[in-house]
Amino acid sequence: MADSSLDQAKQAVRTQIWDALTAADAVHDASVHGRIPHFKGAEEAAARLAELPVWKNAEVIKCVPDKAQLPVRIRALEEGKTVYMAVPKLATAKPFYLLDPATLPVPPAEAAQSRVAASFAPTVDVDALSPLDLIILGSVAVNRTGARLGKGAGYSDIEFALLMEAGLVTESTTVVTTVDALQITDIRIPTTDHDVAVDVIVAPNKTIVCRAPHRPSGVLWSDLAAEQITAIPALASRRRPSPAG
């Protein structure tokens, strides 16, 4: 499938899910299109996630900064877990915020908010992160094979690839997404080699374990546009020179 056709197919799935969420009044967003849905069952999904052994055993997690995953970040900090959260658009040389539950200047419910975290949390480079026990992603759509779609910017995939190359995640690192049940689709989700699939889907009323989800082995430079690399310092600083000739 050509890139343009692939993008169109992905966008068609996103639009279907956004429309379904809007019709069901299942989100807090005034307009959910173009966003990771802030679904109304986010707290229930976080509570269900917190019952899983993979959560209970995790000491260090990376979680997206989206509103839908705020209850996950709050729980993690309240339970003494270290939380890494990406700087918006990975736009700084040190692209992750470090939320250390032992040194928070405000309660976890405040510290976990992305804007508050940005006001106090130190930023760290990829190589300075501790190995991750668990990764929590937001999604627009996900199917039972673990294939997922974000809002289309690709930042979660880039983060994962950078962490994979740094040895901070492995094939066995669990990746979870929390979603509304309406975001779980039986539609085939078109994917590419750089797309990160999830191991576990957690909705307010169900948990789905996915088999053999796809993982990129690292940064697929040929899939990145020059302007993407330039805009993300962590990529630009790690780009390997092209072979001479």
Give, region by region, the residue ranges found by the protein language model.
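Extended, H/D-rich, highly charged conserved domains that either
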Residues: 61-77, 81-83
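Short, contiguous, pocket-lining structural segments
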Residues: 5, 9, 37, 41, ...
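Short hydrophobic beta-strand segments
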Residues: 57-64, 136
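Amphipathic alpha-helical interface surfaces
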Residues: 45, 72, 155-159
